């Protein structure tokens, strides 16, 4: 089966992940930021930004998983999530400093 997108960003908007998040750290705001960035760049047909209710990484949130790389990123805010977007789509340097390091 051929997948319809080249890159998929899954952003946790679950209650536990976002319970202590403030300001630009909330999952919904991160999702909105990346959706707007994606639209501005005209990548909507090949890059998809989605909200998910739980990635089961609540203590490390806000979190995002990117496919097809399979990398999970943690402790994000809007600026760092945008840096991850740019890195994963080839427009910026890799961000290993934001990768989930394990439990």
Task: Label every PLM stretch briefly.
Residues 7-23, 50-67:
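Local cysteine-cluster metal-coordination motifs and their immediate loop/turn environment
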Residues 28-32, 68-70, 83-85, 92-95:
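Short, low-complexity, polar/charged sequence segments that are solvent-exposed and flexible
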Residues 33-41, 74-90:
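Short microdomains enriched in Cys/His and/or Lys/Arg
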Residues 56-78, 93-103:
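Short flanking/linker segments adjacent to small metal-binding domains or redox-active Cys/His motifs
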Residues 26-30, 34, 50, 54, ...:
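Amphipathic alpha-helical interface surfaces
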Residues 1-2, 41-50, 76, 80:
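Phosphate-binding glycine-rich loops and adjacent basic patches that engage nucleotide phosphates
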Residues 2, 7-44:
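Small-residue-enriched alpha-helical segments and adjacent helix-cap loops
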Residues 44-55, 82-103:
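Short Fe-S-cluster ligation motifs
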